[in-house]
Amino acid sequence: AEVLLGSSDGGLVFEPSTFSVASGEKIVFKNNAGFPHNVVFDEDEIPAGVDASKISMSEEDLLNAPGETYAVTLTEKGTYSFYCAPHQGAGMVGKVTVN
């Protein structure tokens, strides 16, 4: 699965913002627009027993250039909420369901 960080017109969004993957399927988050973005999973909104720090970028770590990527593989089934730390206040949030 590929998720774009930022819309082509510069919007502060994940595209798609809600999606599903199979357990063990790689998710590639790809910076699309000219803003620094990152991917942080919300420790309160992921399946129990999953360590958010092991699947998240650091809040200070950013994908600065268009085309830069961050890949993660989720195996525990359930719903995971994530956000872009710099733009969470602007509504740059998403959700993935692992089936």
From Swiss-Prot:
GO molecular function: copper ion binding; electron transfer activity
Cofactor dependence: Cu(2+)
Membrane topology: Peripheral membrane protein
Keyword list, A-Z: Chloroplast, Copper, Electron transport, Membrane, Metal-binding, Plastid, Thylakoid, Transport
InterPro entries with a match to the protein in the record: BlueCu_1, BlueCu_1_BS, Copper_blue_Plastocyanin, Cupredoxin, Plastocyanin
A GO cellular component annotation in the UniProt record: chloroplast thylakoid membrane
Stored PROSITE patterns: COPPER_BLUE
Binding residue positions for Cu cation: 37, 84, 87, 92
Subcellular location: Plastid, Chloroplast thylakoid membrane
Chief localization: plastid
Domain of life: Eukaryota
SUPFAM superfamilies membership: Cupredoxins
Domain Plastocyanin-like, chain residue ranges per copy: 1-99
Key word Acyltransferase present: no
NCBIfam families: cyanin_plasto (TIGR02656)
Membership in a protein family: Belongs to the plastocyanin family.
Annotated function: Participates in electron transfer between P700 and the cytochrome b6-f complex in photosystem I.
Listed name of the protein: Plastocyanin
Organism: Lactuca sativa
